[in-house]
Amino acid sequence: MKKKFLLILFCVLSPLLLIASSIDSISTTYKDGQFTTYSQVFVNASDSTCSLVIKDYDYQMRYNLDALFPWALKGMNLRKEKKELMMFYFKSTSFNKESNVLRGIGDVIIPGVITFPNIYVDCKLTSKPTINGNSTVYLNLLSSNGFIKNMNNSFSVIPSANKKGNWFILVTNVRFGWFFNIFITEKRFKSIMEWRLKQFIHNLKNEAEHRTVSSHQTSVNNFHSPKN
């Protein structure tokens, strides 16, 4: 009972502890085959801008994967742009509106060793409103043909304490299938997965801040434009 209480307390307090920190951070822990990664970045953008960025990502992940590569998936090497210890080719996604199930399909390549073609991952994609008026997006694994054994992720937008920006909070929990569980050690996880999670959350931050600057510049230009 005591252990269960401590676990619940940890889950409740973890996001608050992340928010309390004044710097961007990412860290991964490993226990019993599961990698848990906590990521946070401060975003100098309004609630509405941050929420719109997340909504755009959510929509494009469901219906227009290719549109994500110039911004949300930029620099993540998900289409074999450069050679690595483990490479990915993220081919496509399809979304079932009735069941809220998102299927992603791609290849996993270990250069010179083996290629696993057309690995699929079926996930339940949901979004729930939070008390601050934003929403948390959840991505939970339903089934996969080998690469991932278990996965649940959450992405939240949390207002900063001074109300002058927001925090993007990404929490990922993943267990790999038997072969990948052997291959992806704690050390390799950082070079295969953790840096991609960091790149992803910074991509969303950069997009939100870029939209903020562009919106401000447009307002300034409109203010100074000649009035007829």
Model-derived features: positions:
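Sec-dependent N-terminal signal peptides
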Residues: K4-L18
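Hydrophobic ligand-binding cavity/cleft-lining segments
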Residues: A20-V101
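Amphipathic hydrophobic-ligand
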Residues: G33-Q34, K82-E84, T115-D122, F147-S154, ...
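Extracytoplasmic/secreted proteins, especially bacterial periplasmic and envelope-associated proteins
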Residues: T49-L52, R188, I192-W195, Q199, ...
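Sec-exported extracytoplasmic/periplasmic mature domains
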Residues: K55-L65, K198-E209
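Surface-exposed patches in mature extracellular/periplasmic domains of secreted proteins
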Residues: D66-A67, T212-H216
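Glycine-rich portal/gate segments that line the openings of hydrophobic small-molecule binding cavities
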Residues: L73-N145, V174-G177, Q199, N203-R211, ...
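Beta-strand/loop substructures that line and gate deep hydrophobic ligand-binding cavities in soluble
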Residues: S127-E194
